[in-house]
Amino acid sequence: MNKILILGGTGMLGNAIVRHFKNNNNYEVHFTYRNEKVAFENFNKENAIRFDCLNDNILNLPKNIDYVINCIGIIKPFMYNDIKNSILINSVFPHNVSNWCKNNNIRMIHISTDCVFSGLHGKYNELSYHDALDDYGKSKSLGEPKNKCMILRTSIIGEEIHKDASLISWTKSQKGKEVNGYLNHFWNGCNSGPKMI
């Protein structure tokens, strides 16, 4: 049975991945959380690890893991709430995880973003030059580990389990109101879908 550690298991993507793998008997799922109330309203305490990537030492995480999926990150709308911590989380922390995984022979999957690309050139692929123009895209670009790991550059949409900060939550709250959108806009995102992993 493969053991998976999901870093950021109570975020939008992380909780979807925890739920997906918990329903599969081929995996033993562990996940990290920061807020106990959020974590245990939605999951049981089994295999849950309190971990704050800014204050806790990654060396204290369990090492008998086969895969680490890094879902920890500051999303674009919150980037400027604390720019220093956003850069530490998006740009520095993934390299710490990557080195820890390498030293412990753990396979790493790092969730990045398609925002490492500006969108000006279109039809990007995994070898395309990162040309982000904003701080968020640049922070995520800097955070892509160079050690051997799988990097998924995607855009997700879904609901947060602990706050009404997502686009879907906002759209649902607009019941009866006109909501503006886009025409002829290409988007290749996922609905917080763990199946991409």
Identify the role of each PLM range.
Residues 45-89:
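NAD(P)H-binding glycine-rich loop region in Rossmannoid oxidoreductase-like domains
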Residues 78-84, 119-122, 163:
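Conserved catalytic-core motifs of eukaryotic protein kinase domains, centered on the activation segment
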